[in-house]
A protein has these predicted regions:
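PP2C/PPM-type serine/threonine phosphatase catalytic domain
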Residues: 1-253
Length: 253
């Protein structure tokens, strides 16, 4: 598989700290973004633990495709899905343990959106409101559903999209790593095609930049150019939150 990737993060115009984190491992084909929550540096700690745990765990987990599952746990998934699921479980446990051991960080947690490219497939793990997009054949597809209060209201038909965008509860997420012992991450797969372009991003980007502009940027830019343009666009529109983007271009499957 021939691919190229680039990632970047920016604190934005309103925040001093950057609670976002990202992961790029071209050797493994593993990429991720995380958006920490909790304040008092807790968000920074949680997002860093998430991507570091993912990066450390996945090489070993992918190298143990035939290992016996722990007692009481059934492995019915594709080996890559199982590895990604286990890595998310380990990241959640690591954040949960840090919370319990550090009284200064009682409320910390993080979103996580991860992409694994392997065996001509894209494997995506997602929890929270960071997103994964696929730009294919001129169309932008959102591959993840936000785990947030307003997104759930839109899906239920209670809110319109306009109401969701202006709601004071639009930043309230309903799932995150580190909050509960069961992370409840969603995992999906998709067959790859030549010229697929993936975007992983935190809500600091999607709150500021419309899908139409994201499409134009992904259609006409290299991964590095795309990331730089998207971060700049979010800041030009106010940069009210930390902004993180990872763009992966599958040149040839």
């Amino acid at each position: 598989m021939k691919r190229t990737a680039f990632g970047g993060t920016d604190p934005g115009k309103k925040r001093v700290n950057n609670e976002d984190a990202l992961l790029l491992n071209d050797t493994l084909g593993l990429y991720a973004v995380a958006d920490g929550i909790g304040g008092n540096e807790g968000g920074e700690v949680a997002s860093r633990i998430a991507v570091e745990t993912l990066g450390r765990a996945m090489p070993d987990l992918l190298g143990e495709k035939d290992r016996t599952p722990p007692v009481g746990r059934v492995r019915a998934d594709d080996p890559s899905v199982s590895a990604l699921r286990e890595a998310v479980f380990l990241a959640n446990r690591a954040i949960h343990q840090e919370r319990s051991q550090n009284a200064a960080l009682p409320n910390m947690g993080t979103t996580l959106t991860a992409l694994l490219l392997r065996d001509k497939q894209a494997f995506i793990a997602h929890i929270g409101d960071s997103r994964a997009y696929l730009f294919r054949a001129g169309k932008l597809l959102q591959l993840t559903d936000d785990h947030s209060f307003v997104a759930e209201q839109v899906r239920a038909g209670t809110f319109t999209l306009e109401q969701a965008r202006s709601s004071p509860y639009r930043h309230m997420i309903t799932r995150a790593l580190g909050i509960a012992k069961d992370a409840q991450a969603e995992l999906t797969t998709r067959a790859l095609k030549n010229d697929d372009r993936f975007l992983l991003c935190t809500d600091g980007l999607t709150e500021m930049v419309a899908d139409a502009e994201i499409s134009r940027v992904l259609a006409s830019s290299s991964p590095q150019e795309a990331v730089q343009k998207l971060l700049a666009a979010a800041n030009e529109r106010g940069g009210v939150d930390n902004i993180t983007a990872v763009v992966v271009w599958v040149v040839e499957v």
